Amino acid sequence: MLCHVTRPDAVVMEIEVDAKANGEDCLNKVCRKLGIIEVDYFGLQFSGSKGENLWLNLRNRISQQMDNLTPCRLRLRVKFFVEPHLILQEQTRHLFFMHVKEDLHRGHLRMCSEQAQELSALLAQAEFGDYNQNTAKYWYTELCGSEPNQTTINSIIAKHKALEGLSQASVEYQALQLVSSLEHYGVEWHWARDAEAQRLAIGVGPEGIAICRDDFSLVNRISYPIIQIATQSGKSVYLTVTKESSDSVVLLFKLISNRAASGLYRAITETHAFYRCDTVTNAVMMQYSRDFKGHLASLFLNENINLGKKYVFDIRRTSKEVYDYARRALYNAGIVDMMSRPGERTPSNRSPSREQEGALDCGGCQQSRLLQEKLQKLREALLCMLCCEEEIDAAFCPCGHMVCCQNCAAQLQSCPVCRSEVEHVQHVYLPTCTSLLNLTIGENSPEPIHRGMAAHTCTTNDYSTSEKIYQN
């Protein structure tokens, strides 16, 4: 089966997959061609029969989800946006930048005049290079929604000239840093109508759900902790939300089709799991539906039969797990400088699997690298699982689990491992040699993982809420 996959920069890739292939088979081939290991940030989109934008479920067959397979037309898109400093590969960062440019052009990201001026200069430097009055073009009108006056134009030109000499990679990184500070960065938009048939834009993002009018002016904001349950029925999605008075209210959103409603339900559940949870629970991973044939087979043959089974969600890792997985994968592939520094652009045709292949030829080097990797894993295992900076030196009582430092433990009301209530925190001394943590394991080893994102602290109430979101 032939798949035409359009990248965010409008380049079309031809991907050949088996007729019974799942969505992840196609995505993995695309990312392999691009040299991208951070696959979990991306997804494949297609257009439904009514023009709705739908995510291909990567765990289900492509042929069961799309209407037209001659050829299969898909779009490579960023599904989960993270902070720029958490992106380990230059290729990944470039695709993030191209996707953000498209969102800016569509008006999905709003900003003030000063931000629009700075971003206009950065986009011009990335696209046209150093300032040239004959070639420079600016996006100010698209970014700010108004025509610039001469003073504004002069300010943009001055900012553009100040960027002279900066590489494309450095400028793209700065642009992503600016965009990541905007209100709707990483928000996925769904068009729906409320109970009064008023057209709304429903934005599902890392912090919660934004309900906006047609012009993206905010009507209401719902954070994940106050969502009791999210359900889908036909073309409708229902959100049961706790108000400040502790009463519950049910919000109704009517979408254009059943698949569009399923897309909104998926977005709420998967986005919550990716950004707000420590790991993806089985309640999400194993939720599925069956067609009629599969339902009959499960009744008369075996309840666990895979015939006709379609998974509801395709998320496999949370943001923390993606970062850790990608870092280890890059290190195991022999890449030393995973965090490409701004100003040093990685060639687009460089494959991670071929990085430093000459440096790992001899058996002694391989053995040394394995020992370094084991030592690095030991060091990381002794770090707090929440902040990943301090050593583990606290035990939760009465359960006895030891997974974090005293500073993080003092902020938790329940154990993150067993969810039992914490009565008090006991300071402990792990039976390890302190000098081990200070060993230098060579230049080729990555630094201990220091996450730039704030760890989410789940209380007992928060945990029960997150479980309810996954009900269908």
UniProtKB/Swiss-Prot annotation:
SMART domains registered for this protein in UniProt: B41, FERM_C
Q: Where are the zinc fingers (RING-type)?
A: 384-419
Q: Which GO terms describe its cellular component?
A: cytoplasm; cytoskeleton; cytosol
Extract one GO molecular function annotation from the record: ubiquitin-protein transferase activity
- Where the record annotates domain FERM, the positions are 1-279
What's any GO biological process attached to this entry?
A: negative regulation of Wnt signaling pathway
Q: In which pathway does it act?
A: Protein modification; protein ubiquitination
Q: In which tissues is it expressed?
A: Ubiquitous.
Where's it mainly located?
cytoplasm
Q: What is its EC number?
A: 2.3.2.27
Record flagged with keyword Cell membrane: no
Q: What does the record give as the reaction this protein catalyses?
A: S-ubiquitinyl-[E2 ubiquitin-conjugating enzyme]-L-cysteine + [acceptor protein]-L-lysine = [E2 ubiquitin-conjugating enzyme]-L-cysteine + N(6)-ubiquitinyl-[acceptor protein]-L-lysine
TM annotation in the entry: none
Q: Which keywords, in A-to-Z order, does the entry hold?
A: Cytoplasm, Developmental protein, Gastrulation, Metal-binding, Transferase, Ubl conjugation pathway, Zinc, Zinc-finger
Q: Where in the cell is it found?
A: Cytoplasm, Cytosol
- The protein's assembly and partners: Interacts with anxa5.
Functional description taken from the UniProt entry: E3 ubiquitin-protein ligase that mediates ubiquitination and subsequent proteasomal degradation of myosin regulatory light chain (MRLC). Regulates cell movements during gastrulation by acting downstream of fz7 to antagonize the frizzled-signaling pathway.
Q: What is this protein called?
A: E3 ubiquitin-protein ligase MYLIP-A
